Amino acid sequence: MRVTNTSMSRIMMDSMANRTVEYAKLNEQLTSGKRVNKISDDPVASMQLVQLENSKSDVNQYKTNVVRLSGNYSVQEASLKSLEGQLLVVRDKLLAAKNGNHSATESATFGREINLLLDGMMSDLNTKNSEGNYLFAGTKTNIEPVEYNKTTQIYTFKGNNERRDAVVGNGITLQENTDLSSSLSASGNNLEILTNLKKLANKMIDSSIKPAAYNQEISDNLAAIEIGAKKIGGMLTDLGAKQNRLEHLSNLHDDVEVVNANLEKDLAGIDILQVNSAMQSNFLSTKIAHSMQAKISQLSLFNYI
């Protein structure tokens, strides 16, 4: 079969066009650092990369949640330790008031000191996180959970004991909040321990009331304090366990990120030296093709005589 100059020219032009497309593809790979830049480059790898991107996005969100939750736990832990410490100081004040023959003035001093400590405990119960949300209000994070009514001398809990959960891993959630108010309540979240301490402190301040009149109340409050302190201690232990869990999850997410990065490299990564070599080979082939095309276009019938 005779191949005409026109056919040969068309073949050469198609070959150069293909080389140009291939060169552009190689250049795009070199620029992006990726072998797969669009679905047509490798449909199977493209689908795997989409799934990988979803995995990376999930891991990033998990890591963000872990950091935020760990910060919240740290603030909660500090508040619990402060509350526990002040509660134990109140216990010491009551023990001192109960075990000695104190004057009305001395008892009043104990009462005022206890009131100051109660103010500090109320502040701990109304702790906010860095986002401005109340940590110990259950799901009512925008409402100050603890209020005190001076007229009735009663502490009231305005939050709830519902849990807030954070997703920190694939199918893994951890409770964000601590039901701290229950540690100072005889039942539910009535804050009875705080209320009874407040009423006792006010009696101690009132010089018209003899210490013997509230001696039994001191004993009752001491027993309640021991129960409350024990509950807070349990909550601190629970927070410590949660922090350890978060640390483990954080390390796990770091490992998954490394695995994802290696998978992405295997699926879409390039060998720069190999791509450069292919581009040079493509360039030389195209240059030779141009030269041949130029010579073919100059041929005439006289070249065949």
PLM feature spans:
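Amphipathic alpha-helical polymerization modules
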Residues: 1-141, 202-305
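Cysteine-poor, low-complexity segments in flexible/peripheral regions
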Residues: 140-210
